[in-house]
Every structure is written in structure tokens, then in C-alpha cells.
Amino acid sequence: MRCLNMIMAEPPGLITICLLGYLLGADCTVFLDHEDATKVLSRPKRYNSGKLEEFVQGNLERECMEEKCSFEEAREVFENTEKTTEFWKQYVDGDQCESNPCLNGGICKDDINSYECWCQTGFEGKNCELDVTCNIKNGRCKQFCKLDADNKVVCSCTTGYQLAEDQKSCEPAVPFPCGRVSVPHISTTHTRAETLFLNMDYENSTTDYENSAEAEKNVDNVTQPLNDLTRIVGGKTAKPGQFPWQVLLKGKIDAFCGGSIINEKWVVTAAHCINPDVEITVVAGEHNTEETEHTEQKRNVIRTILHHSYNASVNKYSHDIALLELDEPLTLNSYVTPICVADREYTNTFLKFGYGYVSGWGKVFNKGRPATILQYLKVPLVDRATCLRSTKFTIYNNMFCAGFHEGGKDSCQGDSGGPHVTEVEGINFLTGIISWGEECAMKGKYGIYTKVSRYVNWIKEKTKLT
């Protein structure tokens, strides 16, 4: 301050001398000591709020907080690509997981302009919103699905198959497992199980017709259809071995019905086909009834079991199912193979897939002559309401309709007792038995089938089928 007073009072020459002294650190005290200077230059450290705080270290504040940095600059701070990437996802566009978008216990992982949910077992989807237990997509199992004690999906297979390495698919465990077409020249895959399961409402599919109010009809309300042995008009000619579970039932003179191989000793057919006075011969491996093809196997029936609820005097087509025991076991091969029988729930589910295959040597057109070569037809399932409206006859809840409204295609006389099968991932399951109908292939009329799902427990009990 003394120097400043001198500058104001003295002439210019003295001012020059005073300024020189100032620059040389003379008596003018204008510089602060070290401690005071440090206080002036210091500033409070920034606080980094939010999830980014855990990433801030080293020179990150200078590199990326005070000004926008590049990924490479951030990498220099972390010296670790994984940590840098995790920081970068939040740094660029904020935390996408802040709103907790993942459902059902899913864990959210932030990404640039997006996020990823790591779902708990049994759930999937963008936000883990989809239940992938057995109720949806069948747990991705190709055949059967159930939940274990921890509510985790466990897949399983029908008899003669085992789980493949993926624990979802099924592969043969025996040379000639049920429901499998093994003749090399025949393509077997008409449908894919995954597609079918994906397109189904599985929970609703297990609801049987018996829950329908329209199905509650008294079994004593007896009305008989027009055709006694009704049940392939407009079908295609099968190749040898294409339906190896199909059998032909013959009396002493003529063939009269069809059937399906359950195992080496048992065949299932329609109860109305059985006449106690007629000895039945079962022909397996048959294709052309007018030629010997050396694939045929003939067996005599030694015991017939009609379903205990079947009563032809009350109604000839209610509980229309019977089992035939053979005198000797069939020899299984590519032309003689049993059909698969699932449990009640899955048999009903497979039926609801919508399409099935029927086969037989019945009449190839209404009032025509029987076929000599095995015929087959793909038929759509008809909803129950439409089925009931199509006929004046009683349709019980142990029956279902299949066929075409426009007519021209149907099972027909002589096909009775034959199989209605549904293919699931190349494996065929019995879902119906050809039973009856009004004429054959008439417009607005459908084929009526015995619903096998109602009888699978009985079939397995009587035939010892596991």
C-alpha cells in the first residue's frame, strides 16, 4: 500500500523506479503465500449421483463428465473392456432399466437404446411376460410335458421312445416304436408339433366336449343314424407301409371293418363291428386285398372286450369301442407297427390340433363298392356346435365330428372301426375311431367318430399298455 501512495504523489521518473521494484519483488507485497493461494484456487469436488457413480475413478471425471468423451477415452480410464462397456451403455443414453421393465422376477441389463431381460425359469419374452411352462407351447416339449416339484418343465415321451440330447425331442428306443412310419420311401412329416403347440391355447384345448351345455343329452334319448356300417370317399391311395397300424377285420367270407394295432397282442375297433356269431380274423400288414404282398400277418381273435358302457339295444354307437385279443403276437416290422396311445389329456389336446388322418378299405363312393387298396383322407375337426346342427341324430359327448361341409370326402361303409390319427412331430397318436354317419360324403354332413380320449385308461388297463 505504501508503494501505491508513492506512485500517486511522486513524478513520473519515480513511478518507473517503483514499478521496477514491484516486478523484482521489492517492498510491494502483491503475491499471496502458498497456503492462502491454495485456498483461493481450490473448488468443491463434483458429486456424481446415480448409478454412474460406481464407475467414476481415475480421470473419468475429467475425461467424460466435464466434456463428452469417446469409448476409447473411457477405456483408458477403466483399462477393462467389460467394465467400459457396462459404463458406456448408461453413459450414452441413460439407464433403460430404471423403470424396471422385466416381469416375473426377471433381471434387467441395460443396453444402448434398449435393454435385455434375463428371465426366471418358466418365463420368456421381451419382458419375461410369457409363461413357458406346460400351459404355453407345451414347455417346448415335442410330446409330453409336466412340472416337477420346483415348477420346472420336464419333458417325456410315449412308450418306445426316449428323450433326445436336447431333453425336448423324442427318439426311438426300440426298432419299431409306435406311431412311426419306417418304410424308407414314405415321407412321414405332415405337420410339426412345435407349430401346432405354438398356435394352440393349451389350457382351453384340454376342455372336453362334456363341459358343453349342448353335450348334456340323456343317453336314453335313442335315435339311430341311417347308416349301419357307415363310416373313404374322395381319398388317396396309400402306399405300402404308410399306415402300418391299420388292420382289416374279416369274417369267413368278406372283410367288414377296420381296426388299429395297440400292441403285439391287441387291436382296437368299433364295438358295433362285433357280431358274437362271427369268427374274426385280423389281417395286419395288408395293402391290396386282391394280391398277396408277403407283408400280411393273419391272426385269429380269441377274446373280444366291449366297453362296459356299450349297449347296442340302447344305442348302437354310444361308447362304440371294443378290444380284440389275438391268438399269437404280431411280429412288428415296417408294415406292422402299433399306433401310439397318449393319456386322456394329451389325446384330447392332439385331437384339437384340428386335422387327423383316417384310413380304410371302405366304399370309395356312396353306395359304391369297397376299395381293394388302402385309402386315406385328411379330415378337419368340426366344432361341436356345427356338428350338432348338422344332424337330427344324437351326438353324445363321447363322439366328435370331422369332415368337409361341402361334401365329396368322407369315411364310408366298411371303414368302421378304423383309426383317426393325429401326427405329432412325425409320430402318430390314436385320437378317434371311425363310427357312423348319414350316407357318405353328403354336403352338410360329417363323419362321426368315437372320442378315444374318453377311453384311454380303459384301453391301457385291458391291454396292459404302459
From Swiss-Prot:
InterPro entries: Coagulation_fac-like_Gla_dom, EGF-like_Ca-bd_dom, EGF-like_dom, EGF-type_Asp/Asn_hydroxyl_site, EGF_Ca-bd_CS, GLA-like_dom_SF, GLA_domain, Pept_S1A_FX
GO process annotations (BP): blood coagulation; proteolysis; zymogen activation
Residues that, per the record, bind Ca(2+) 2: N48, E53, E54, E63, E73
Compartments (UniProt record): Secreted
Domain EGF-like: 93-129, 130-171
Gene3D superfamilies in alphabetical order: Coagulation Factor IX, Laminin, Trypsin-like serine proteases
Residues noted as binding Ca(2+) 1 in the record, renumbered to the chain: Y47, E53, E63, E67
Protein modification: The iron and 2-oxoglutarate dependent 3-hydroxylation of aspartate and asparagine is (R) stereospecific within EGF domains.
GO cellular component: extracellular space
Residues that bear Phosphoserine: S114, S205
Residues engaged in binding Ca(2+) 5: E72, E76
Entry protein name: Coagulation factor IX
(3R)-3-hydroxyaspartate carried by residues: D110
Binding-site residues for Mg(2+) 2, renumbered to this chain: E72, E76
Species this chain originates from: Felis catus (Cat)
Domain Gla residue range list: 47-92
